């Protein structure tokens, strides 16, 4: 990959829940069972995820490099065209920063609530 770290596709938990809800409605209307991938359709490297998390949190993240795992593909990006076509689904959180920001906001609110 461009920066030497694995690239993965991400999807926000609310977008994932929305897709599952749409799938349930589809099946209740008599739709056939389908296997579909969910994702943004674009990948982000491990380094890009770290940089995004640093931007969102304002914290420096200290990482360490490790050897690649055996059999781990360098790039995995979901093709969610089937779920878009069948269910009319599309992600509402379309940037890595927005995905990380909502996770960070949730984490901070949970931490505050559990004090």
Task: Name each model-derived stretch.
Residues 1-115:
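C-terminal substrate-binding subdomain of Rossmann-fold SDR/epimerase-dehydratase oxidoreductases
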């Amino acid at each position: 990959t461009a920066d030497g770290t694995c690239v993965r596709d991400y999807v926000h938990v609310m977008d994932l829940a929305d897709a599952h809800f749409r799938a349930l409605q589809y099946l209740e209307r008599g739709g056939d069972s389908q296997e579909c991938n969910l994702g943004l359709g674009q990948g982000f490297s491990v380094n890009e995820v770290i940089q995004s998390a640093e931007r969102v949190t304002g914290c420096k993240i200290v990482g360490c490099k490790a050897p690649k795992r055996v059999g781990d593909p360098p790039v995995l990006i979901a093709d969610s065209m089937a779920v878009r076509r069948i269910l009319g689904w599309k992600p509402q959180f379309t940037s890595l920063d927005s995905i990380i920001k909502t996770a960070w906001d949730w984490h901070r609110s949970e931490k505050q609530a559990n004090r």
